[in-house]
Amino acid sequence: LHWAELVSGQFFQDHQKRFQRSKSADQMLLNNLKSVRQQLKKLQLDYNTIHDLLARIIFIQFLFDRKDSQGHPALNQEFLDHLHEIGELSARYSGLPELLGNHRDTYRFFRWLNDRFNGDLFPGKGATEAEREVEWRTEEQKVTQRHLNLLAEFVSGELEMETGQRCLWQQYSFDAIPLDFISSIYEEFVRENTTDKGVHYTPGHIVDFILDGVLPWDSEVWNIQILDPACGSGIFLVKAFQRLIHRWKKANRGAEITSNILKSLLERNLFGIDINPQAVRVASFSLYLTMCDEIDPRRYWQEVRFPRLRDRQLICADFFQEDREGFRTQLDSDQYDLVVGNAPWGKNSMTPLAKSWAKANQWETSYGDIGLLFLPKAADVTKPGGQIAMMQPALALIFNQVGTAKKFREKLFSKFKIEEIVNLSALRFGLFKDAISPTCIITMSVMSPDGEPLIYICPKPVLTNQDDYHIVIEPQDINSIYPQEAIKDPLVWTALMWGGRRDLALVRRLSKLKSLGDMEKNQIVVSTQGIIRGNRKERDETLIGKRILKQFPDETFLFLKTEQLDINNDPYAERPRKSKSKAFESPQLMIKQSWQTKTKRFRAAIARLDQQTQKGIICTESYVSVHVDETDLSVLEAACVSYNSKLAVYYLLLSSGRFASYIPEVKPKDLLRVPIPKYRVGLLNNIETIEDVDLYIRESFSFKDSEWILIEDIFNYTLPDFKGDNSSPGRQTTRRSSKNNSESVLTEYCEYFVRVLKAGFGQDKNVCATIFQEHNTAHLPIRLVAIHLKGSGTEGVQIEPIDSPTLLEQLKRLDKLFLDKANQDDGGIFYQRVARIYDSVQLNGQTIPTIYLIKPDKIRYWTRSMALRDADEVAADIMMWRSELDKTSEVMEESSRG
């Protein structure tokens, strides 16, 4: 195993089957818990009691497995014997399964544990002794010996699961229960019994990623107030608790953190809200386990007293309630230093209280989505200068262009300083197993904007099982967006998701060109989406007898032979409106709304009419029909060429939020924004192949070489990588495309890199490049290229062996550097997987400034468009250093004069 196989991700890609999350021990135990839960339900036990019992036996098993510094568990057979000797238990028991076989002793043991630990794990939390006793007796009557026998079989490993196998309980080690496991219990148990589909479990590594930005480990500030307004399983609060503990230890070096200090942190520094009472139960349990994790088990019985959290620090309520202390907009303003969490969202997810709050505070949202409202409400209860870091719906926050969405975005970005937005849209299938709509993370400060740009990060999937455990952020995934851009220009979010500043500039230019949408505003064209049958209550007799396009025939290219289409005999259609019926008249251009996987393009064709279709055809809702007068037929021909071209794919990926982040289908309004070329009569007569289409588009729009490269690389690599798998072109090695070690991919990369530097600093500059290639050794999963900035007697691109002693020594140093940085907050190549090193080398007796570029051996890192971006960044660095050098020189001159 070579170090580079790990840092590049190649090892995990080659051995994916060995790292399947579904076969991990915690996932298998979770399935066991689901099974026993259903069996208890069949025995007429309610879910609330089932959840309490399961949490209780997990905690008790934790006590059996958790060992102190001398290797002794907190609970064992000797301890149970002691409880018998002092009269707490009526008999001696060898372990938990045997104890569960006695209903009376089981509940005596539960009561004894409650006296020791207090907290919310057991019943009996009423205000008076009588109320507490009623709670205990109610549960004792509900839970029968049959229920306890089932649990005894379960924890002994004898209970048969639905799969026919025995359960895993005995093989699982409970001394260090993963947080993700507790969260998974929440996801599986709590969400299964709710109609609230806007709630989404947050993977642990995403929580760590969010907290790294707002609550990093390397600080001694621990006395801060943290709120999670939609706490769910409590994973944000638990991980925040762990970080506060770490900070306390750092601030009190040498001091031992006691149970009382931990209890104080829970009671004073952490606050959670959730509308689901089951979520509050799970969150409380998670925090108790975290507290126990910090204390030596020898001290459990003398020191540990869990604080009451439910209805105190963990509130079951709607965050938009204004009558509960702790999160009232006015009375509790400026209370928290930090608000974190994963807000629920979704169409029509708004609660009545949220609607009232939004109206009273003048915040509008789109489609009844509650998610965005958590941001301004959180800001109201956060101290000035405090921070908010929450997961949000990406479509609603950054992509949606309806009026209410624009107003919300403008108000939010104008009122608060937005620090960072991490667009996780490309990762959604890896992050969430139910593939919910795209999500993002927003970090904002409760202060007015200062004009500084926000950081916009769009990580991409590695397409290995690594995606289940961490996020890979590479340099090309990071862009800066200025506040006014964020407010006024919707293109920044889509263009910079898949491209860079050059792409944004090109898409902005293309958006100003003529399109069918513009021409419809000028009443030159009429368009409509195809018929939507809907509730089948509306009849339109004019639809009968027309041919209907349901799917383009395979051989369709530019023209549609309508005689191959079926005749429609169904008069029912909810849409389009009859005012748009002219769009179904001839001449017609039919445009497919979705990107085609097979051709990697969109598809459009002009309807060629037969005797049956002289007055036009209709189409299904997956198509758009565009009509013009006969005199403007050349408009449709020009548009037809554009929609079949690489340009349409490029433009729509970088301008349509739906296509860029969600599904490969574009809404009609976005589709009609595609720029169309110059139109002329008989345009299609000279176009016979798809290559002719692209050639005409390139010539008609007068694209520069650097612009066409952007279009081609998005088409050839970026989009197939997003919609494809490991076999997509951009994920192949650079060597696969080269013959006889010619290095065609890297050579083109270097040539365009050099071209950019010469364009910026002068064609007379002798900039050259070296591609390093292994010689008589196995191929590394990374590539190394050097760009030399001064004359060395050579030009162009050279290929050199990588086995020189000096270079190998340098790679060894890099090896150590990368591995050392892999565990640091800033990541290094294990996370960023790319390095750019500024150095100098001796060539022909000269000291030559040199830039080393080290990236994974995948084509997508070495495309021509990536060369343009990398060279732009290098040029910017050089200009910045020159500017700083000039300033230093001026200061030195002034000093010498003085």
Q: Predicted regions span which residues?
A:
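Structural motif
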Residues: 41-54, 173-180, 365-366, 585, ...
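Long recognition/docking surfaces used for binding and targeting
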Residues: 84-190
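Conserved S-adenosyl-L-methionine
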Residues: 202-323, 392-395, 404, 408
